[in-house]
Amino acid sequence: MPKPEAGYRPPFNQTLVYGAQWRVFNAGTATLRMEQAGQESRIIGTADATGAVAVLYHVRDRFETFLNPTDFCSRNISKNAEEGYRKVDTTISFDYHRRKALLDQKNIKKKETKHTENDIPGCVTDIISAIYYVGSLPLQPGKTFSFPLNDGGKTVNVDIHVEAREQVKTPAGTYYAFRVQPEAPEGVLKNKGKLWVWYSDDAARIPVQMRGHMFWGTLTLTLQRIERK
């Protein structure tokens, strides 16, 4: 995996609060927070549908991941997903000694369990910590970075294209930001439409906006505020 930019300082103890927009609707809220946990870093994420969208499709997701803060190699990630009538708890542990990703999943509604093991290289990132990892890289328009990502199944190589530097206005402020597009030929990003993330062009490199063009419409997450504590 490409190394973080020299001098990068993780945005510890900052809760990033996002508002979600789908078509003309306020679709919900999401949060991201990174904090120190002993010798590791911990990232906590949430996503909740609200308003009319919640009536149409219930969403209440919770994520927690632990990683090595120097190289962003993921240690484990837990996901509690409530989406529609589906409720699934997932834990993925990365055993670098055995070079395996161990997935344990429990479908609460169906009372079914699943255990799988898949090969991994000497360092991988997960779907949540990858958001911060990309921000740690020396982003400049025209650059491309590649890294392995694992979400419990087969490890995939993700290509990150830095497309442009542009101004982004958010309720949290106006930022100059790098527009980044991730692509992968298979795995968790395949058939997900087109995705973009805008990272602030400053020392924090926080994701100030995220957008996905999917078959069911465009979903945009825009930074509303930063809670520092």
Mark where each language-model region is.
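Acidic, serine/threonine-rich low-complexity disordered tracts
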Residues: 1-96, 133-229
